[in-house]
């Protein structure tokens, strides 16, 4: 073996020359106590509020309480392997998550890690989860419809792009079903190759404290119906630690803001915020923050307001993007006056109130039209819908009032009887099976038939059959009429004449 001293000395000189004396510094602290997902850490004197820290076993946490002699850290994971005396390292970054189109069709946890077994995300961008909401200047008032495909909502409680509309009701009243149908209703806009990017709405579903089986079922329905391709699922299930349930809505919101700030449109459903409030209460009490009403901390209102204020419609100078929020709140025994429901009602731009009684009567979606309201109103409707839906809300309100009195008196005059008959048929018309969202122009035609007396002669049980037959006829023989309503966005006298002729002919032959 030939050893050349000159070569060896040359290599050694190179290595000595390139020797780097810089060491990697990181500020570390020690765990004083740990339990219930909270660690008290000593020694992290310069840590920021909301900064990520890493424990010696690789689990991450977030510094929430900055006290004189220690730091309260919430742990994003199991605290079983963390012991007193373990080292904790500052990571120097505030909590952030991956964002961008790479997340579409994926299921991620509250920190943006994939949990669907489909491999890494390869996202090119990251965003902080807790950022300031857009100010007044970049915003624009809500004026574009955000179609849900549900007649009861699109006609009576319209939602616009950039609005925050609360879905509130007891357990098992169909709150998640409304979110699911709204997601499915965006499918035609994504399938339409000729449609512009402005018509597409990307959907984000944040599951907070749900059963894993429920989330899996939601994902399965989206996948089967081809809606997962434009959706992101953020899941912090019931078995996840409270800090994960607390941060999941903020993470989902950051993912939606990516689309909003790039001139696109996104819709986010938080299911549900009452469980996030419970998780936040648990963390706050364990961090020894003073409790307030119902033992919630004093800043639980701020928790929800800063989250929901991030839903906005931006003006043209800022890209005209939008983020629409559909927060869900679960009530106990229809008590809307509890702490969290009243908080979120006061933050949002209206609420869709679902009632158990209506649900069991077979009125589904079980929307209480009297208590539900949209504070954006007809600004979020196309003119055609305004033309037909303007009278329906008043008629239904009168019907409910009369129906209450009619229980006591049997001899009713003809006009009252007519009002009750019309109301019963309109209520029947607003029923809609799950997974069958309707296009806006189809809703307009069916409601037009209802408010113009075409249902009055029918038995209430025939209303659904009449509607299905009418829509089948229009789709097969008169698609150009539906297309005209969709493109012109109003019912002109010419279209009205054609529609009346079709309805007259159909009603005459209907049996």
UniProtKB/Swiss-Prot annotation:
Keywords, comma-separated and alphabetical: ATP synthesis, ATP-binding, Cell inner membrane, Cell membrane, CF(1), Hydrogen ion transport, Ion transport, Membrane, Nucleotide-binding, Translocase, Transport
CDD domains linked to this entry: ATP-synt_F1_alpha_C, ATP-synt_F1_alpha_N, F1-ATPase_alpha_CD
Signal peptide: none
Claim: ATP-binding is one of the keywords in the record: yes
Gene Ontology CC: one annotated term: proton-transporting ATP synthase complex
The EC number(s) this enzyme carries: 7.1.2.2
Family: Belongs to the ATPase alpha/beta chains family.
Protein's UniProt name: ATP synthase subunit alpha
Native source organism of the sequence: Bartonella bacilliformis (strain ATCC 35685 / KC583 / Herrer 020/F12,63)
Lineage: Bacteria, Pseudomonadati, Pseudomonadota, Alphaproteobacteria, Hyphomicrobiales
Gene name linked to the record: atpA
């Amino acid at each position: 073996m030939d050893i050349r001293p000159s070569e060896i000395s040359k290599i050694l000189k190179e290595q000595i020359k390139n020797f780097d004396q810089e060491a990697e510094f990181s500020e570390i602290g020690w765990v004083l106590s740990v339990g219930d997902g909270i660690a008290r850490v000593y020694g992290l004197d310069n840590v920021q509020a909301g900064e990520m820290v890493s424990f010696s076993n690789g689990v991450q946490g977030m510094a929430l309480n900055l006290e004189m002699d220690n730091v309260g850290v919430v742990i994003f994971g199991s605290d079983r392997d963390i012991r007193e005396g373990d080292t904790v390292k500052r990571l120097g970054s505030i909590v952030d998550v991956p964002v961008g189109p790479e997340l579409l069709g994926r299921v991620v946890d509250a920190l943006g890690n994939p949990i669907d077994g489909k491999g890494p995300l390869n996202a090119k961008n990251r965003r902080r989860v807790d950022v300031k909401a857009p100010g007044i200047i970049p915003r624009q008032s809500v004026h574009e419809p955000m179609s849900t495909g549900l007649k009861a909502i699109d006609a009576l409680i319209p939602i616009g792009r950039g609005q925050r509309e609360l879905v509130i009701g007891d357990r098992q009243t169909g709150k998640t079903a409304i979110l699911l149908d709204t997601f499915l209703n965006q499918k035609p806009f994504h399938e339409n190759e000729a449609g512009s990017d402005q018509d597409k709405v990307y959907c984000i579903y944040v599951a907070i404290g749900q059963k894993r089986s429920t989330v899996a079922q939601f994902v399965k329905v989206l996948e089967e119906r081809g809606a997962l391709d434009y959706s992101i699922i953020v899941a912090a299930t019931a078995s996840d630690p409270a800090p994960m349930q607390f941060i999941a809505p903020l993470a989902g919101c950051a993912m939606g803001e990516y689309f909003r700030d790039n001139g696109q449109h996104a819709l986010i459903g938080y299911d549900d915020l009452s469980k996030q409030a419970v998780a936040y209460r648990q963390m706050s009490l364990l961090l020894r923050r003073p409790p307030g009403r119902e033992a919630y901390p004093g800043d639980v209102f701020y928790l929800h307001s800063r989250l929901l204020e991030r839903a906005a419609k931006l003006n043209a100078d800022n890209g005209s993007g939008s983020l629409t929020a559909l927060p869900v709140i679960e009530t106990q025994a229809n008590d809307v006056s509890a702490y969290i429901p009243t908080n979120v009602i006061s933050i949002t731009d209206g609420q869709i109130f679902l009632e158990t009684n209506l649900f069991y009567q077979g009125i589904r979606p079980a929307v209480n039209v009297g208590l539900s309201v949209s504070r954006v109103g007809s600004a979020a409707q196309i003119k055609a819908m305004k033309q037909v839906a303007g009278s329906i809300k008043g008629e239904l309100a009168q019907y409910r009032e009369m129906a209450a009195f009619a229980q006591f008196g049997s001899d009713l005059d003809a006009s009252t009887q007519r009002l009750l008959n019309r109301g019963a048929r309109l209520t029947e018309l607003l029923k809609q099976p799950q997974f069958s969202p309707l296009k806006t122009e189809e809703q307009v035609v069916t409601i037009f038939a209802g408010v113009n007396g075409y249902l009055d002669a029918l038995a209430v049980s025939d209303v659904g059959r009449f509607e299905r037959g009418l829509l089948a006829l229009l789709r097969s023989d008169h698609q150009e009429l539906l297309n005209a309503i969709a493109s012109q966005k109003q019912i002109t006298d010419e279209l009205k004449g054609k529609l009346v002729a079709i309805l007259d002919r159909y009603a005459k032959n209907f049996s």
